[in-house]
Amino acid sequence: MIFSILEHILTHISFSVVSIVMTIYFLTLLVNLDESIGFYYSSDKGIIITFFSITGFLFTRWIFSGHFPLSNLYESLIFLSWAFSIIHMISFFNKKRKKNLNAITAPSAIFIQGFATSGLLNKMPQSAILVPALQSQWLMMHVSMMVLGYGALLCGSLLSIALLVITFRKVGPFFYKKNINRKKFLTEFFSFDVLYYINERNSILLKQNINLSFSRNYYRYQLIEQLDYWSYRIISLGFLFLTIGILSGAVWANETWGSYWNWDPKETWAFITWTIFAIYLHIKTKQNGRGINSAIVASIGFLVIWICYFGVNLLGIGLHSYGSFTSN
């Protein structure tokens, strides 16, 4: 009973803090930077609170259930939100303070955690005894690596999508336009113009004491370079996690089912995901720099990851059907 109450408290704290962080984050884009910079840094620190809340939740559930909390969709979503908070903190503690990355990780964390705590998963939060197939020391290694890989690949893919949007977008950021109606504001607010604005505003702040003028194209190019820089490195990290997860899963499958690979839906889509991002890394290696082709491949990979992550859970078939919607 105590563990259950503590889980609910920690979950609500983390979700509430992330919601407040998102509110503060977007409000700071609508007011003067000098007046809002303190609130912006406070919102970044809120992610740290979220990280420790989710960490406490995972440890509490681990102690209560007696196994690592990655046995169903609810727990894996919370762990995925935890992974996004780690990526967010990497940019927070980075000396250059890459706010472009924060614009991706914070909304992703609140969306995933909001879905995990929604009524759609109301039957999953309760801990249960593991099915025999999951009672293995490989559970922590395999599932944690896969979820961390999903988190990093999703984040890197979103940055690549932002790169494509900003590259092909001809209209300047809406923050500089006056007399914007409410409908248009809401439509463009959730486009990647927010990343454009953050970069240009910060660049102007850094140069405000120097009598130099930079064209908007320079800031646009600088932003594209930053997005490409971070997407490549985050996707590379996610690809490493995914590779380790697939290999450890193959060893686990051989111990449990007597075969390293069975081509069930989850394994098939995991292989497709791995192949797509292997192509991405190959293109990046050949390009030796920024490229649209690699960003397109990463954007396709974004959709494939969600199919791989939720496909089996929606269908409830195959060897990985445990923890799915239908099995609960």
UniProtKB/Swiss-Prot annotation:
Q: Name one GO biological process term.
A: cytochrome complex assembly
Q: Where are the transmembrane segments?
A: 13-33, 46-66, 73-93, 101-121, 146-166, 234-254, 263-283, 295-315
**Record membrane topology:** Multi-pass membrane protein
Q: Any idea where this protein resides?
A: Plastid, Chloroplast thylakoid membrane
Q: Which ranges form a coiled coil?
A: none
Q: Which Pfam family, any one, appears in the UniProt record? A: Cytochrom_C_asm
Q: Which UniProt keywords apply?
A: Chloroplast, Cytochrome c-type biogenesis, Membrane, Plastid, Thylakoid, Transmembrane, Transmembrane helix
The Gene Ontology terms for molecular function here are: heme binding
For this record, an example GO cellular component is: plasma membrane
Q: Which domain of life is it from?
A: Eukaryota
The keyword Magnesium is assigned to this record: no
By sequence similarity, the record places it as follows: Belongs to the CcmF/CycK/Ccl1/NrfE/CcsA family.
Quaternary state and partners of this protein? May interact with Ccs1.
NCBIfam families listed in its UniProt record: cytochr_II_ccsB
Q: Name the job this protein performs.
A: Required during biogenesis of c-type cytochromes (cytochrome c6 and cytochrome f) at the step of heme attachment.
Name of the molecule in the record: Cytochrome c biogenesis protein CcsA
What organism does the UniProt record list as the source? Aethionema grandiflorum (Persian stone-cress)
